[in-house]
């Protein structure tokens, strides 16, 4: 069997016996200008880069759960029609999450063509509370890869899995097996580590998921004692070059609206906001959830995310 990856990121299998002819096609030249993208394309790319361990369809909606590890992996992605009236859909959503001892969240978006301003209004009218807002930024990938090398004293190690050192810098406590499964999910996942002065304690880390033309950056975190030294840029440049070598040409990331340092860094790299996205908490979810940040553990189950103070974060989700 041959595994073929389409430009959309979808993988298909073709029996070798069905292949008549083939040739090596080089990667398309990397674009230096910013990409064009629809909300739906970006929403689906972002969802593939941070996959839940459990999912179920409700019409065209997707219900996602991952033992409370981040709202993104424990919320409904409501793209399209749920197939039932909205009140019935929301009731089913609350029941589904209650059965898993999780609060019910719906992830929506605003600010671009095809986003969900009407759904946001309908949720608010029914008592759902907008708990967290962040932004999706996009930009051309090549300019990031074109940034100068940082020098021989800044080695970036790329790996397919997050090792103990990477997890030690990742701003979480008690990362569970479920969390590791979510972190490792995606079409082509890379973890970057800049070794620190002490063995086993990285100076900086990052994560990138390559999916067709897109490279998604996340978990870019720097030791606070080493901030303002370009380490975040170093990490992203190394990951961008890896993504370019796999044929990607566009980049995306997610950042909190009040994270001024991250926004300034990404703007210098050529990123710009595409749309905002929000997590709405259902009115019957009385068991948990936290309003402390955009990427916290939710619900009562152990082994999730608790924001600490050991690193400087360059993205929120």
What are these regions (language model features)?
Residues 129-139, 254, 267, 272-285:
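Conserved catalytic-core motifs of GNAT/GCN5-like acyltransferases
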Residues 108-115, 224, 253-263, 280-285:
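Conserved beta-strand-loop-alpha-helix junction that forms the acyl-donor binding cleft
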Residues 86-165, 280-281:
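Acyl-donor-binding surface of acyltransferase catalytic domains
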Residues 100-109, 243-254:
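Conserved GNAT acetyl-CoA-binding A-motif
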Residues 148-219:
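Flexible, substrate/cofactor-facing loop regions flanked by secondary structure
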Residues 113-128, 233, 257-276:
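Conserved active-site alpha-helix within GNAT-family acetyltransferase domains
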């Amino acid at each position: 069997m041959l595994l073929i990856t389409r430009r959309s990121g979808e993988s298909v299998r073709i029996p070798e016996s069905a292949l008549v002819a083939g040739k090596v096609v080089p990667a398309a030249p990397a674009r230096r200008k910013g990409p064009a993208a629809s909300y739906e394309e970006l929403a689906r790319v972002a969802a593939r880069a941070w996959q839940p361990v459990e999912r179920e369809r409700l019409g065209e909606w997707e219900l996602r759960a991952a033992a409370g590890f981040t709202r993104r992996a424990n919320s409904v992605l409501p793209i399209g029609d749920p197939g039932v009236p909205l009140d019935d859909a929301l009731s089913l959503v609350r029941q589904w999450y209650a059965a898993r001892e999780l609060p019910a969240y719906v992830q929506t978006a605003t600010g671009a063509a095809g986003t969900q301003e009407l759904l946001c209004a309908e949720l608010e009218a029914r008592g759902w509370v907008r708990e967290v807002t962040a932004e999706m930024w996009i930009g051309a990938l090549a300019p990031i890869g074109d940034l100068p090398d940082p020098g021989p004293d800044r080695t970036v190690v790329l790996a397919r899995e997050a090792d103990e050192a990477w997890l030690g810098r990742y701003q979480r406590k008690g990362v569970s097996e479920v969390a590791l499964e979510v972190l490792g999910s995606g079409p082509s996942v890379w973890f970057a580590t800049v070794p620190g002065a002490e063995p086993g304690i990285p100076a900086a880390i990052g994560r990138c998921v390559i999916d067709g033309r897109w490279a998604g950056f996340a978990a870019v975190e720097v030791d606070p004692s080493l901030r303002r030294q370009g380490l975040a840029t170093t990490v992203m440049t190394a990951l961008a070059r890896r993504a370019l070598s796999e044929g990607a040409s566009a980049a995306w990331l997610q950042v909190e609206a009040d994270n001024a340092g991250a926004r300034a860094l990404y703007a210098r790299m050529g990123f710009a906001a595409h749309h905002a996205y929000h997590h709405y908490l259902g009115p019957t979810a009385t068991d948990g959830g936290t309003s402390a940040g955009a990427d916290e553990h939710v619900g009562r189950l152990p082994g999730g995310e608790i924001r600490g103070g050991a690193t400087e974060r360059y993205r929120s989700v």
